């Protein structure tokens, strides 16, 4: 089970939100590159970046910070980015910077053809991000909840060549309330695409539960507030996950 530290970028700084609310931002670092190096030194084997401003604006907004992170760690570990990936040109430009993968979120819901086209243009490097509130997909930086169920959406992408699906339970994100294991497993069992859990990771019991769900197609988990506030020691958690594989 791969644990992936999240670095959420807002106006060039590393922050964490609660339930995706920009006004609920806690600043953890003024140097995202130093944060990236820290997680690499703690044993991270991949990093998850989110351009929060980009998610709301529709185009990435934190290019200097992203470049600094890539300069610091991209030679050692893969880095993925979501937030503002709404067209092929933007996706290509950011992959050319040295990102390993990009995450298509809002555009995957609004324009599923983009996912298909991106997978053809950049094979193996496209991740779909599905964010849900009570099972229904949310878009535009979680500002709008649609009438689409995430499982129905996920099934659309099965034959497109999507690398994986990141499933975020908005109600749990940043709330330290535990991962929604049931919903994550239900999604993973419904599609042939590996699913990465996100939102709510709180303690080692969540790690154990996620590892037990690996057989259902849950391939990893993204962790944010828990490792920043110290309720989970990242190195210890990854060692536990490795021991349970």
Swiss-Prot record:
Pfam families per the UniProt record, alphabetical: His_biosynth (PF00977)
GO biological process: L-histidine biosynthetic process; L-tryptophan biosynthetic process
Coiled coil segments of this chain: none
UniProt-recorded name of the protein: 1-(5-phosphoribosyl)-5-[(5-phosphoribosylamino)methylideneamino] imidazole-4-carboxamide isomerase
Family annotation (InterPro entries): Aldolase_TIM, His_biosynth, HisA_bact_arch, Isoase_HisA-like, Isoase_HisA-like_bact, RibuloseP-bd_barrel
UniProt-listed SUPFAM superfamilies: Ribulose-phoshate binding barrel
HAMAP family assigned to the protein according to its UniProt record, in alphabetical order: HisA
Molecular function terms, GO-annotated: 1-(5-phosphoribosyl)-5-[(5-phosphoribosylamino)methylideneamino]imidazole-4-carboxamide isomerase activity
Keywords: Amino-acid biosynthesis, Cytoplasm, Histidine biosynthesis, Isomerase
Pathway(s) of this molecule: Amino-acid biosynthesis; L-histidine biosynthesis; L-histidine from 5-phospho-alpha-D-ribose 1-diphosphate: step 4/9
PANTHER family registered for this protein in UniProt: 1-(5-PHOSPHORIBOSYL)-5-[(5-PHOSPHORIBOSYLAMINO)METHYLIDENEAMINO] IMIDAZOLE-4-CARBOXAMIDE ISOMERASE
Gene coding for it: hisA
């Amino acid at each position: 089970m791969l644990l992936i530290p999240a670095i959420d970028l807002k106006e060039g700084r590393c922050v964490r939100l609660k339930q995706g609310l920009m006004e609920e931002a806690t600043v953890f670092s003024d140097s995202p590159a130093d944060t990236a190096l820290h997680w690499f030194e703690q044993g991270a084997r991949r990093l998850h970046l989110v351009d929060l401003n980009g998610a709301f604006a529709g185009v990435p907004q934190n290019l200097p910070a992203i470049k600094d992170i890539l300069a610091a760690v991209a030679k050692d570990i893969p880095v993925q980015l979501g937030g503002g990936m709404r067209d092929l040109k933007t996706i290509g430009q950011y992959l050319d910077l040295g990102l390993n993968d990009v995450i298509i979120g809002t555009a995957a819901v609004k324009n599923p053809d983009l996912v298909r086209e991106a997978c053809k243009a950049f094979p193996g490097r496209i991740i779909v991000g599905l964010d849900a509130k009570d099972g229904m997909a949310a878009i535009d930086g979680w500002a709008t909840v649609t009438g689409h169920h995430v499982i129905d959406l996920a099934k659309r992408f099965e034959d497109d060549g999507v690398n994986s699906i990141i499933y975020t339970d908005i109600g749990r994100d940043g709330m330290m309330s535990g991962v929604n294991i049931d919903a994550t497993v239900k999604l993973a069992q419904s599609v042939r695409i590996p699913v990465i859990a996100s939102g709510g990771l709180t303690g080692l019991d969540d790690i154990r539960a996620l590892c037990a769900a690996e057989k259902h197609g849950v391939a990893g988990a993204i962790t944010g507030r828990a490792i920043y506030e110290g309720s989970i020691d990242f190195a210890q958690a990854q060692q536990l996950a490795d021991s349970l594989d």
